[in-house]
């Protein structure tokens, strides 16, 4: 997209996410201990069974990070993954596919496909679990398809995120947080701030602090 800083941070986020999920997987995927019952000869044992194929559909905002945040835990859980990034932001797909195809063991379980909304239904119908991360409009579409096919799904989409500033809030921190949340990635983020509600007694001071700091924002 031409924004070097955001692209670097997006890549670094994915690298940190890989490390973080690997640590989490060590804990939650550990073989559970047998549980005793009231019958001495009978014990209970939990076994984890991954979904054979997880379908991932991601939006155009932070396209690489939002795609990988769904792929990483699915692979660690033992599932194969077929993923469709947004057709609006496809430039990273060729590089990602090149890396996947060069990596033994990964190319057998991970496939990145390109396409428009026309492939949403076949992708969902061939998946055992559907993950979506993107816009609210497309989230409804994916959710409807998954429900009609009786597919379990995880749907995450952007909302009108709100900040509430109370009378006793730290206004310096609040003004900086509002600017960061509103301007990060030029405001194109599923977690960007859309509304700010401020206590009337601190409204004017907060307004002028935001105005002052925004003059230095590039």
PLM feature spans:
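Generic hydrophobic/aromatic pocket-lining and core-packing "Φ" positions
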Residues: 71-72, 120, 175
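N-terminal Rossmann-like NAD(P)+-binding subdomain of aldehyde/semialdehyde dehydrogenases
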Residues: 1-42
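Short acidic capping loops at alpha-helix termini that bridge into adjacent secondary structure
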Residues: 53, 107-110
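A structured beta-alpha segment of the ubiquitous adenosine-cofactor-binding alpha/beta core
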Residues: 43-44, 111-129
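Conserved small-residue-rich beta-alpha loop and adjacent elements
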Residues: 35-103
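Beta-loop-alpha module in the N-terminal Rossmann-like domain of NAD(P)-dependent dehydrogenases
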Residues: 54, 61, 114-122, 134-141
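Periplasmic-binding protein-like
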Residues: 72, 129-133
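ALDH superfamily catalytic-core signature
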Residues: 104, 128-129, 137-218
